[in-house]
Design a protein with these regions (language model features):
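Non-cleavable N-terminal signal-anchor transmembrane helices
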Residues: 6, 11-71
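A short glycine-rich, His/Asp/Glu-containing loop-to-beta-strand
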Residues: 55-94, 187-224
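Short, conserved beta-strand element in jelly-roll/cupin
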Residues: 101-116, 210-215, 224
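Long, mid-chain structured domain cores
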Residues: 109-112, 116-126, 143
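Histidine-centered metal-chelating micro-motifs
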Residues: 115, 132-133, 137-145
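Short acidic-glycine-tyrosine-enriched beta hairpin
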Residues: 121-137
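Surface-exposed beta-loop interaction hotspot
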Residues: 144-203, 208-210
Length: 224
């Protein structure tokens, strides 16, 4: 059941029908857990709760919603079709909004072998490998396509709630802020590429980056 405030802000209506049950079930929903219960998880239970797999399916939008910070992780690999951001997602049932980014912002990375294009409200953004696109709250129609179906783009995305709007921005790997860390001796020499970061652009609350390990290095952060 969902509550929705009417435009005049005087009446609150309750809706519990006309929901796309298939679309709701297609989005994986993860719940938070307390530390006492987590101590008793088996390896399989830990993987089921904490690990995201199967993000990329041809011409599909795969989404995982977490009740921790209300974050949504998405994966899209368009091959033969142009894929909408809300494909397979009942936005009204899951978020109580009329379109995906009505009250959300999103960061988009292309981690695929080929280049791709993201179209937001009619404006196209071309993403090569390791490029990033920030879309602010309020973009109504967002679609994804690959330049070459033989070498499709793979869009990795994270969306967070947003209460204010800024500007959409394409950030290339060259434009990202660089932060070198680690050393060869400890096998963790790496560069933190800060794409969606206050030093690069303004966002509501989302930050995203990409870590690049140097040859011979094999870990990022040592588990505590």
């Amino acid at each position: 059941m969902l509550y929705n405030r009417c435009k005049d802000s005087k009446i609150c209506l309750l809706f519990n029908n006309h929901l796309d049950e298939e679309a709701i079930s297609r989005m994986d929903i993860r719940y938070s857990c307390n530390q006492r219960d987590f101590k008793r998880y088996t390896t399989e239970e830990t993987r089921n709760e904490m690990l995201i797999t199967g993000l990329y399916k041809a011409d599909e939008m795969v989404a995982v919603y977490s009740h921790v910070d209300r974050m949504v992780t998405l994966g899209c690999m368009p091959v033969h079709e142009e894929v909408s951001i809300d494909k397979g997602i009942d936005v009204w049932a899951n978020f109580g909004t009329h379109y995906f980014l009505e009250r959300r912002e999103i960061g988009i990375f292309n981690i695929g072998d080929g280049a791709g294009t993201v179209t937001a409200d009619g404006k196209e953004y071309h993403l090569n490998y390791k490029d990033c696109l920030y879309l602010t709250k309020g973009n109504q129609k967002v679609t994804f396509k690959s330049d070459d179906p033989e070498h499709p783009a793979k869009f990795y995305m994270v969306s967070a709630p947003a209460h204010c709007s800024y500007e959409n921005k394409l950030i290339t790997i060259e434009q990202a802020a660089k932060r070198p860390l680690g050393s060869v001796e400890t096998c963790n020499k790496r560069t933190i590429n800060q794409f969606i970061h206050p030093s690069v652009l303004k966002t509501c609350q989302l930050s995203m980056g990409m870590t690049a390990l140097e040859p011979g290095s094999n870990w990022n952060t040592m588990p505590s």
